[in-house]
Amino acid sequence: MNTPLAHTPPMGWNSWNTFGWNINEELIKTVADYFVESGLKDAGYEYIVIDDCWSEKQRDENGRLVPDINKFPNGIKPVADYIHSKGLKFGIYSCAGTHTCAGYPGSFEHEFDDAETFAEWGVDYLKYDYCYKPKCADGENLYKRMAMALRNCGRDIVFSACNWGNDGVLNWIRESGAHLFRSTGDIQDNWLSIQSIVESQLTHEAYSGVYCHNDMDMLVVGMHGKGDNAEVLGKVVGGCTDTEYKTHFALWAMKNSPLMIGCDVRKMTPETKEILTNADIIAINQDTECRGPYCIRQWNNPEKVFALVKPLCGGDYAIGMFNFSDKKSEMSLQFFDIGLPTSSGRGLELYDCHAHEILGTYTERYAAQIESHDCLVFRAKVVKL
């Protein structure tokens, strides 16, 4: 109990993006089965998280949360036990307000009781949303309350704070006790949403680190317009190309965001599975130093191309070159900007994390043509010439 949790960004699956309120015991168990059978577990994904709409609309006579008898007729603990039997971990959802975002009971003024309930059920991860916040309470206090409750519930539970970047969260979230925190609004399954989130995060590197990770929201990789978050104001606007999903995943990995899958893993295409299980990209995300990347080309340049560079444990560097423009663009990466002057007598050996091969050793610069909405990601090793 109270062992260090989430040294690196959590990896797993959340039910909301695809299923919304339409969840049940059979579905969650089947997802756990597919985690094992598809290789997702072996790739490092471990949390199966039930989002909103899992409970009854009212608490019981003792003020305790009650699972929806139609969705979870055997309760929550047997589901958690089943997931644990697969060598995975189980997560659940609640809210800092009086109600959840979908109108179910929230944890306001029930924080310690709910934390104990979650511990009794075998919960390993809590996503804690921010709807129906009482006017008398501020976000910092609400998240500190649940953090304290979880730290005293008798079980180690990863605490995912989801207040969408409100109330100056960057200034207080680390000391609150949360292990990850949302600093953006909800993601949608479309390229414009991904681009907007990335734009909002280019100055947030300093706020994320070991044991407290900046959550850029769940992944939409592989959704292809099918799911609960594919609509905006009733209109279907969802779906990205596999190239865009590849870039989306690479950016989340480079930025140390938790990697929480949102698609229906039972129906993954080979392309989706290849993106989500790319061991070289995942290794960048799970690097134990958890250092944020720095941007060496500014976002607002006319071509909308930029590069991120991230120091890795052992002396290597992750380098991502991204083209957010609507046309093919040439990008030149000057090694001087990374910190490698010509006078050093050294170059960079570049390993392509998508082709899974060494490209060669380069001096001073590397240039490439990058397709629209595509990316190149390298693991770079400094070598003597």
What spans do the regions from the language model cover?
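C-terminal beta-strand-rich structural cap/linker in extracellular carbohydrate-active enzymes
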Residues: 360-385
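Active-site beta-loop-alpha junctions enriched in small/polar residues
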Residues: 16-18, 53, 95-99, 131-133, ...
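Catalytic cores of secreted or luminal carbohydrate-active enzymes
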Residues: 247-299
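Solvent-exposed beta-hairpin/edge-strand motifs
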Residues: 337-355
